[in-house]
From Swiss-Prot:
This is 26S proteasome non-ATPase regulatory subunit 6. Belongs to the proteasome subunit S10 family. It comes from Drosophila melanogaster. The keyword RNA-binding does not apply. Residues 193-361 form the PCI domain. InterPro entries: PCI_dom (IPR000717), Rpn7/CSN1 (IPR019585), Rpn7_N (IPR045135), RPN7_PSMD6_C (IPR049549), WH_DNA-bd_sf (IPR036390). The gene is Rpn7.
Length: 389
């Protein structure tokens, strides 16, 4: 596990993703009127003179603009940008290329810090053009990815992840290679690619230093959540249950530990209880909020599948008791997921019995081949008609 003091050596939290999280909470009905959250956000805005972002969130959250505050912050921004421009001009006239780059970088970072997204993007591109070092170029690209994560600008994120991958192939060091994996993992969570997220996160558990995105316990929490939904049971055991770095942190995250082990140890009632807690957490997370219902549904299916695979048949009553729910609830759940083809079982409501119906892999492959063959044949026939014409 990374030493705690490594956090001080990491990149600056610019933009600060915690502010994006706080702003997101204020969009939810239960937090919309939360005075403490609003005060926390306004304090951060005042401290950094974030005039552009203040205007943005007032529009998005429906707040009344404090015109005096906005005017003061804009004036501070104007003075600071003038000083930064003067420093750039002086460096261009009197100093070397490195000093010119540093002056441009300071302006880029300032524009990013105050929430002027468009100006920050332009300034970072200009700084990138004046940067020769591969490592420094990668740092600028990482900054742009963070800017994209702050605003959830998917185009900005994907373009710069692609650019970072290209630069890494040109010869990036191990620290930046690992940092890119963490950034890719975070974005994979945001777009619901949990399998990719699990791969990226598990690859960097022992080398994590991306404290500009999150602290290490939060990283481990994400890692466990995505690994549980993405990995088969044997890989979950080898990479998470037996992962010493993860287990060390889980001592301080009892809720995550109990969620993980309740599923692995087939304690389904406890699993359901902890899944409800996970649902609340994911709903309040700005990155994964759009997918929290999907995650919870897939984890329910995973729990049902794991139980059903242990039996040829079992009673609805036993299954309901295993999950700590009513027979009516489990009956509705099974009917829904069986009809959708997500569970391989059939329910005898008269006898109150659930019979498993494991698919034969060879038969499934045969049916899939026939289906693909039919599709190919139809396309060939359509193509032949076009050619004949």
């Amino acid at each position: 596990m990374p030493a705690e003091n490594l956090e001080e050596q990491g990149l600056e939290k610019n933009p600060n993703l915690e502010l994006a999280q706080t702003k997101f909470l204020l969009t939810l009905a239960e937090y919309k009127q939360d005075a403490a959250l609003k005060a926390k956000l306004l304090e951060a805005i005042r401290t950094e003179n974030m005039a552009p972002w203040y205007e943005h969130i007032c529009s998005e959250l429906g707040w009344t603009v404090d015109k005096d505050l906005l005017a003061r912050m804009k004036e501070n921004n104007r003075v600071e940008v003038e000083q930064l421009d003067a420093a750039i001009e002086d460096a261009e006239k009197n100093l070397g290329e490195m000093e010119v780059r540093e002056a441009n970088l300071k302006k880029s970072e300032y524009l990013c810090r105050i929430g002027d997204k468009a100006a920050a993007e332009t300034a970072f591109r200009k700084t990138y053009e004046k940067t020769v070092s591969l490592g420094h170029r990668l740092d600028i690209v990482f900054h742009l990815i963070r800017l994209g994560l702050f605003y959830l600008d998917h185009d900005l994120i994907t373009r710069n992840i692609d650019k970072a991958k290209y630069l890494i192939e040109e010869g990036g060091d191990w620290d930046r290679r690992n940092r890119l994996k963490v950034y890719q993992g975070v974005y994979s969570v945001a777009v619901r690619d949990f399998k990719a997220a699990a791969t990226f996160f598990l690859d960097t558990v022992s080398t994590f230093t991306s404290y500009e995105l999150m602290d290490y316990p939060t990283f481990v929490r994400y890692t466990v959540y995505v690994a549980m939904i993405a990995l088969p049971r044997n890989e979950l055991r080898d990479k998470v249950i037996k992962g010493s770095e993860i287990q060390e942190v889980l001592h301080g995250l009892p809720d995550v530990k109990q969620f993980l082990f309740s599923l692995y140890n087939c304690q389904y009632e406890n699993f359901y209880v902890h899944l409800a807690g996970v649902e609340k957490q994911l709903r309040l997370d700005y990155l994964i909020h759009p997918h929290y219902r999907y995650y919870v549904r897939e984890m329910r299916i995973l729990g049902y599948t794991q139980l059903l695979e242990s039996y040829r048949s079992l009673t609805l009553q036993y299954m309901a008791e295993s999950f700590g729910v009513t027979v009516e609830y489990i009956d509705q759940e099974l009917a829904r997921f069986i009809a959708a083809g997500r569970l391989h079982a059939k329910v005898d409501r008269v006898g109150g019995i659930v019979e498993t119906n494991r698919p034969d892999n060879k038969n499934w492959q045969y049916q899939a081949t026939i289906k693909q063959g039919d599709l190919l044949l139809n396309r060939i026939q359509k193509l032949s008609r076009v050619i004949n014409i």
